[in-house]
Amino acid sequence: MRAVIPYKNENAKSRLSPILSKKDREEFVELMLKDVIKALDDAEVVNIDILTTSAEGIPNDFNGNVTITEPGLNDSINEYLQNANEPILIIMADLPLVTGDHIRKIISFSEDVVIVPGKGGGTNILFIRHPNEFTVKYHDCSFISHCEITDELDKSMHIFDSFLASTDIDEPHDIVELMLHGKGQAKEYAEKRFGSETGKGRVKISHLSKLSGFV
Amino acid sequence: MRAVIPYKNENAKSRLSPILSKKDREEFVELMLKDVIKALDDAEVVNIDILTTSAEGIPNDFNGNVTITEPGLNDSINEYLQNANEPILIIMADLPLVTGDHIRKIISFSEDVVIVPGKGGGTNILFIRHPNEFTVKYHDCSFISHCEITDELDKSMHIFDSFLASTDIDEPHDIVELMLHGKGQAKEYAEKRFGSETGKGRVKISHLSKLSGFV
């Protein structure tokens, strides 16, 4: 099997702009990507590809393949799937709460397709055993689209139920979840930016931080 | 073991008022309560208590105990826990995505305390093996409070990771999750109010509904 991470660094995550500048967001998305790569490493996924429109913001120590593609998430992933000859795990780069344990479970199901929904009808992770036959359709309630595509192919499907894996970081209030439940580098960054010590060895959202209005 | 459901019907869920009238919200919260009771029934939890400030909006076919308490969620639950002499599952009434399978798993962990976090630092479900010793503290990031209380008691803790059980229905966009992932009576109600058929045997959010602005 291989994992593929679609990734955009430049001016990414514009919905976080009320609390993070462009430069900060670019730093933050790279840390989230590092957390996702670490989860894959922890699950002993050795073949990792990044699909990106520019080589900016790829971690220096990343050992996998980086493919520069034209803009267009669906087209670039579908081309990738067409050329794949082994099971493919498509995992988004904004999932810093995902762990190696989640990945191990997701790739161990026997169903043809495993879907991890994102908030609001998104698709955070897709594991596809026979990728040549599959077409992705991200955006516009992709969770429903991917269920329908799987049905139409007469493939079996497992919907993976995890709060942590379903929490993609798009908006300020998602960073609250990251601070509460995270463990990696993106969480550390958020704590430094928005946290204050509670005195009990935990970090809470500082009432002085820009995030306090979003809790 | 026993399950206890804190419940408020009258003028409940005010954050849903942009899309549901007071009367509609009262109908909707009763359906969510029915779904929670069904999940407990499915898990063969036979002793179910409802703590409520008024007998309004209790399902007619509910066979358990209804206790009318003074307002004040923490005080009424803590009094309940003080008098308990068996493990207690505290489950909120606004969890229509929770299933019998979740409940069965939650009550089967060996840890002293099992916590199902809610969005934004809430606590959706708490399973407490030794309830006399425990004090709940809902509101103001109760997830952290309950972790700290468990730590201070030197008890073991399991944090249960489920997107469905962590999705409490507070705001319009939560109803999107209910329509996408629900199976019970509250989901049916939401579909009738806000859905339209896709022609593929699925229901999508109608662009004509009040919910369309929240997707």
From Swiss-Prot, chains A, B:
Enzyme class: transferase
EC number, UniProt record: 2.7.7.68
Statement: the UniProt record of this protein carries the keyword Magnesium: no
Reactions this protein catalyses: (2S)-2-phospholactate + GTP + H(+) = (2S)-lactyl-2-diphospho-5'-guanosine + diphosphate
Origin superkingdom: Archaea
Key words, A-Z: GTP-binding, Nucleotide-binding, Nucleotidyltransferase, Transferase
Pfam family, one: CofC
Example of a GO MF term: GTP binding
Database matches in InterPro entries: CofC, Nucleotide-diphossugar_trans
Quaternary organization: Homodimer.
PANTHER family: 2-PHOSPHO-L-LACTATE GUANYLYLTRANSFERASE (PTHR40392:SF1)
Name the record gives this protein: 2-phospho-L-lactate guanylyltransferase
Organism of derivation: Methanococcoides burtonii (strain DSM 6242 / NBRC 107633 / OCM 468 / ACE-M)
